UniProtKB/Swiss-Prot annotation:
This is Kinetochore protein Spc25. Keywords: Cell cycle, Cell division, Centromere, Chromosome, Coiled coil, Kinetochore, Meiosis, Mitosis, Nucleus. Its main location: nucleus. It comes from Drosophila teissieri (Fruit fly). One of its GO terms (biological process) is meiotic metaphase chromosome alignment.
C-alpha cells in the first residue's frame, strides 16, 4: 500500500511558478512566431510597395514622354496650320497678281492690236503675222486715182540691208516710213510674245532693233 505524502504550500508555489514559466515560454514562442511572420509580411509589403513605386515611376516617365510628344505634335499641327494659311494667302495673292497681269497683258495686247490696225490703215500695209518673227512678210498698197500699186515684201528679219533698202523705197513713194516701222515693230512684238521660247534665239531677239532703222544713218544713204 502506497503512502501519499501531502504537498506542502512551498511545493505548490514552486510547481505553479514552473507551470507559469512553461506557459510564458509557450506564449513567448507564439509571440516570436507572430513577430517573425509580421516582419516577413512587412518586408513583403515593402517590396511590393517598392515594385509599385518603380512601376509608377515608369508609368510617370511614359506619361511625361507621351505628354511631351503630344505637345510637340500639337505645336507642329499649329505651325502646319499657320503655314498652310500663309501658303493659302500667298496663293491667293499670286492668283490675284496673275489675274492683274493677265488683265494688263490683255489690255496692252488690245491697245497694240488697235494701234496695229490704225497703222495698217494709215500706211496701207498688211503684215503676215504667221511669218513673224523670222521673216518680215506682207504688202503695202499705194492708193492711186486710176489703180492701186502693190509693193510686196518678204525679207529675213535679220536682213538689215534689205529692210533698209525697202524703207528707202517706201519713203521715195511718200510712205510714212516711221509709221511703217512702228507697224512692223508692234507686229513683231505680238509675234514674239506668242511664239518666243523661254530663251529666244539671238536673231529673233535682235529683230526689233534691226527693223527700227534710222534713215539718217550712213547705211541708209548707200543705195
Amino acid at each position: 500500500m502506497a503512502i501519499i505524502i501531502p504537498e506542502s504550500s512551498y511545493e505548490r508555489r514552486v510547481k505553479a511558478l514552473y507551470e507559469k514559466q512553461i506557459r510564458m515560454e509557450a506564449l513567448e514562442g507564439k509571440f516570436i512566431k507572430k513577430v517573425y511572420k509580421f516582419n516577413s509580411n512587412l518586408l513583403d509589403v515593402k517590396e511590393a510597395v517598392l515594385r509599385h513605386q518603380r512601376k509608377v515611376g515608369k508609368l510617370q516617365k511614359v506619361v511625361m514622354e507621351r505628354r511631351e510628344e503630344l505637345e510637340k505634335r500639337v505645336s507642329f499641327m499649329e505651325e502646319l496650320a499657320q503655314e498652310l494659311e500663309a501658303t493659302k494667302l500667298r496663293n491667293l495673292a499670286m492668283k490675284e497678281q496673275i489675274k492683274q497681269r493677265k488683265m494688263i497683258a490683255r489690255q496692252r495686247k488690245n491697245e497694240i492690236m488697235e494701234r496695229i490696225q490704225t497703222l495698217s490703215k494709215t500706211t496701207g500695209t498688211y503684215v503676215n503675222q504667221e511669218a513673224l518673227p523670222a521673216r518680215v512678210k506682207g504688202v503695202t498698197v499705194l492708193r492711186g486715182d486710176k489703180r492701186d500699186q502693190l509693193i510686196p515684201f518678204d525679207l529675213n528679219a535679220t536682213d538689215a540691208e534689205g529692210l533698209n533698202s525697202l524703207c528707202q523705197h517706201l519713203e521715195s513713194l511718200n510712205v510714212d516710213v516711221s509709221q511703217w516701222q512702228q507697224l512692223v515693230s508692234l507686229a513683231m512684238d505680238v509675234a514674239m510674245e506668242a511664239r518666243a521660247p523661254t530663251t529666244p534665239p539671238k536673231e529673233v531677239a535682235n529683230c526689233k532693233s534691226i527693223i527700227e532703222i534710222d534713215l539718217t544713218s550712213p547705211t541708209s544713204h548707200q543705195a
